[in-house]
Amino acid sequence: MTERELWERYQRYLCVVPALDFTLDVSRMRFPADYLERMRPRLEEAFGAMEALEKGAVANPDEKRKVGHYWLRAPELAPEPALQKEITDTVAAIHAFAKNVHEGRVKPQKAQRFTHMLIVGIGGSALGPQLVADALGTAKDPMQVSFFDNTDPDGFDRVLAQLGERLSETLTLVISKSGGTKETRNGMLEAERGYSARGLDFSKHAVAVTGAGSELDNHAKKQGWLRAFPMWDWVGGRTSVTSAVGLLPARLQGLDIDALLKGARDMDAATRERDALKNPAALLALMWHYAGDGRGHKDMVILPYKDRLLLMSRYLQQLVMESLGKETDLDGQVVNQGIAVYGNKGSTDQHAYVQQLREGVLNFFATFIEVLKDRDGGSQEVEPGVTSGDYLLGFLLGTRRALYEKDRESLTLTVPDVSARTLGALIALYERAVGFYATLVHINAYHQPGVEAGKKAAGVVLELQRKLTTRLREARAEARTAEQLAADIGMPDEVETVFKVLQHLAANPDRGVTRTPGATPTQARFQAK
């Protein structure tokens, strides 16, 4: 197409959300002229499914659960008055608690005020709060934020070392919907150890966000933690940013959670429009479907041209891939659905993997995120009449053009700024696009059986390790190979796992296992110290 023809296509297919000053440009997607009309019946089904979900229908049939994250920013949509009250009461409680913390009425054991926050969580209990904290945070926030978002011992040590003496001024939020997530449990115990090493009572610095009656909830009450805030079974971890999971840390950080909720609410309202060209979430879902033939054949590359949106691709990895990566459809047929997501930020990407995007394997479509506002205040000129922000836009438009010249398709999402309201709207936009796409391809977007399978497999490994350590203690004087030890514990077919576990134990001197090299690495012998 000529530049003039592309301009005409841009105008024809530009989706505008006036209330939010958002636009979605799909002109660089090469869908045929009749595509949107052909997809209309399936899109109508998606609109119907979303409407039923918002009214309280069971939208997660595998777990027989309602899906209510849209109620969090519009409590009046919740199907029961009691739920409406719980939602509004929780937001009010978050505001009140944060105010008491900031004003020193809720204070640490041996300091005048909480100045830092440590968030212990994983998956949706960390990725959403991390995105919000990084996108909206400033050096002037009343509380600075750190995270335990894994079960990596060295990671725990690094964060605790960075906090140092400020741990006495640190409020720890332990976030787990089920209350039994092992990574989060481990992080909590490591945090307790850190506080104890400094002569501090962890319970006087701890808050829980969890389901009522969960293992974590009961532990927090028994230990006398400062407070517990609720998570509900109708809110999934990856869609929990507008629940206490995201709102409590954001409010404690000093961010405008009312604006975050309003942005999400306004985007929800805009994406109830049944004309795809006026509904950015529906149009996104259709473009994903077109790009990958409804089978996820192309990856989604997220290119935000703004440092504050660096974590957007990580957040969307979970939201999109955990929601859409499913083996079977709603009828139980094997479909192996999903869309792979990756990205970084522009223009850093231009000096990293854009080379392959333009000239390598054509297995992706790109999403550019353009932010109109450069910064608070004015910008200096780096060249006559040109600012650094002008360069950023130039690189975005230049990369978009360079990709299109090589038949690489892209979407461009334009937002006014990176504010709480805009971020709330972006989060809601992708939540709803995922919901629409799931209906288009007939899958359940709201469960994650593959995650549970991984947890069960990890449990098997740890049970094997317990058997191994018991056997090593019994045969203290005798060094044995992985093959021999696997046979000793009655698991000869698990010899590779046995070898990996022994290798790990021997590499850590405090674990009580020594390794004697063999002719090959796998012939090494292990024994208890």
From Swiss-Prot:
Active-site residues per Swiss-Prot or TrEMBL entry: E322 (proton donor), H351, K455
PROSITE patterns registered for this protein in UniProt: P_GLUCOSE_ISOMERASE_2, P_GLUCOSE_ISOMERASE_3
Compartment(s): Cytoplasm
InterPro entries: G6P_Isomerase, Phosphoglucose_isomerase_CS, SIS_dom_sf, SIS_PGI_1, SIS_PGI_2
An example Gene Ontology molecular-function term: monosaccharide binding
Compositional bias segments (type: Polar residues): 517-529
Entry similarity comment: Belongs to the GPI family.
Function, as annotated: Catalyzes the reversible isomerization of glucose-6-phosphate to fructose-6-phosphate.
Protein name: Glucose-6-phosphate isomerase
Organism: Myxococcus xanthus (strain DK1622)
Gene that specifies this protein: pgi
